[in-house]
């Protein structure tokens, strides 16, 4: 686990596969957005409870706890970050469940980085005083 710098936005990237997390980190870092990573749902919840996380990107199929299980547990917290859910098996049922739990966005895997960055920019603008790094 990586500790966040409180002066910037922090995005949680949670998936057991490291490759896309590293790519997203490299894309967000120049924007002034820091990332913290978790390899399973339990680590994701621990980071959400211990760090100031502004948005959480969660894989629906993670070990220990899946992304929707994490979202359900986050909703019981006092101040949970908005979530973006990634899935390689998008179904109407999953989409309905995710939207019912107020997931901000559901994206298919493999991850389209442009869509993910756009979703992150929208979620940070919406939930954090319309501020995206570089906005005037």
Task: Cite the ranges covered by each PLM segment.
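The feature encodes the CheY-like receiver
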Residues: 63, 87, 110
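Alpha4 helix (beta4-alpha4-beta5 surface) of REC/receiver domains from two-component response regulators
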Residues: 69, 90-106
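Acidic, metal-coordinating helix/loop segments flanking the phosphotransfer/catalytic sites
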Residues: 37-55
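Acidic catalytic/metal-coordinating carboxylates
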Residues: 40-43, 65-69
């Amino acid at each position: 686990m990586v500790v966040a710098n409180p002066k910037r936005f922090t995005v949680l990237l949670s998936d057991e596969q490291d490759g896309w997390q590293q790519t997203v980190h490299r894309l967000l870092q120049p924007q002034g957005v820091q990332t913290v990573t978790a390899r399973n749902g339990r680590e994701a919840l621990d980071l959400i409870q211990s760090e100031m996380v502004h948005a959480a990107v969660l894989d629906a199929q993670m070990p220990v706890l899946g992304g929707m299980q994490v979202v359900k547990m986050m909703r019981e917290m006092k101040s949970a970050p908005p979530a973006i859910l990634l899935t390689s098996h998008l179904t109407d049922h999953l989409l309905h469940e995710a939207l019912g739990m107020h997931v901000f966005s559901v994206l298919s895997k493999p991850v389209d980085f442009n869509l993910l960055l756009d979703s992150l920019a929208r979620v940070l603008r919406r939930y954090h005083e319309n501020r995206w790094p570089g906005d005037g």
